[in-house]
Amino acid sequence: MCGTIAFADSTDTNTAVKVNSSSYQDWADRTDISAKFQTNHKPQYSIETLQPIRHYDNNSKSVVFVQGKVTSHGGISHTADGYANHVTRGAGGIIYEIDFNQSTQSIGTTGSLGLGYRRLSKGEHSYVGINAFYDYAFKEHYKRASLGVEYVTGENELYANFYKSLGNGTSSYRIFKRDEMIPAPYNTPDVDVSVGESHEKRVASGYDIGYARTFKNARYIRAYIDRYHWNRMNGEIRDIEWSNPDIYNYNIGFRVNGAYKNGIKTGINVNVTPHISVGMGYDKPFGHSGEFYVQTLYTLGKSKFALFGGKHSDSSMTTARSKMLDKVERQDMQALNLNGDFRVHYPHDSLD
């Protein structure tokens, strides 16, 4: 009899633990693998997880959590290449060739790690949150930090992130001489042509402000709109300051202005099943054509809400509490890459 009583007490305790810890908060339920495809961009693959640091259950009023993510092609480098092949002013100032191109390129694999805190209101109908993240691009060694704030009330979500580049970027140049041909239509060999190569890379600082909404009887749907702004996206590629003032005063340069500096991103995500969600959206930089994107996401565990095989709503807890372990929304890293290639021909006695 005593053994039976002890067994029953143990069972009740285990049941209580399961109820309070909320089985939907299993680590796998907060770990996702995703694939994103966007116009004019390389496919982006990532794995992301959010985990509470301390014990969290349905009686907790606050949570401290860590969030980590590793992404292939986890950011964009706005690249500008300037090229000029010319003669010094003293030799006539002829420009043989000049070219300027701008493009977007992947910055490669990135990693991010963040720490966050969220606290529910007294009635559990809203919560406020704050978070800090560190981002790193492994190939280019770009570094960025961010500070974010959140406010969730009912189905409505408001968030803002402020991004700060770490370091002043990198810049380098080299000047050397070599023999090479004067371009067509001259096609004449020349000697001691001065070649100047310059490179400058820097990470953008900035901010984004977003609004998202879920729906009471269709909690598997989430719509959002996000406004972003980037600083440090302007620059100039120009002739290196040669020791010869005749060359420096030639004043060839290429301005790079506001490359994808401001824009709006909007979209919708749908949990189709407890394991699979799909999303689609539109990214519209001001002054540039917009780009569509689609995203598929696989949850290692299960999402609580889903169109098929999951709940559509939940009255057992407030909406704010059910979102306490949702992932922080942030923008990918942005960078500017300026490259200059200048060839300068001097007058020579043999050509006089």
Language-model region placement:
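Membrane-embedded beta-strand positions of outer-membrane beta-barrel proteins
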Residues: 33-35, 66-68, 98, 130-132, ...
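Extracellular loop and loop/strand-boundary signature of outer-membrane beta-barrel proteins
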Residues: 33-36, 74-76, 80-103, 133-136, ...
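Flexible, glycine-rich linker and terminal segments associated
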Residues: 8-23, 166-224, 230-237, 251, ...
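Transmembrane beta-strands of outer-membrane beta-barrel pores
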Residues: 35-41, 70-76, 102-104, 117-119, ...
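Residues that define the transmembrane beta-barrel architecture of outer-membrane proteins
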Residues: 29, 41-47, 62, 92, ...
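Outer-membrane beta-barrel channels and translocator barrels
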Residues: 54-61, 120-125, 153-156, 216-220, ...
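Short glycine/proline- and aromatic-enriched beta-strand/turn motifs that initiate or cap beta-hairpins
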Residues: 8-56, 63
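Transmembrane beta-barrel domains of outer membrane proteins
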Residues: 50-54, 116-120, 148-152, 210-214, ...
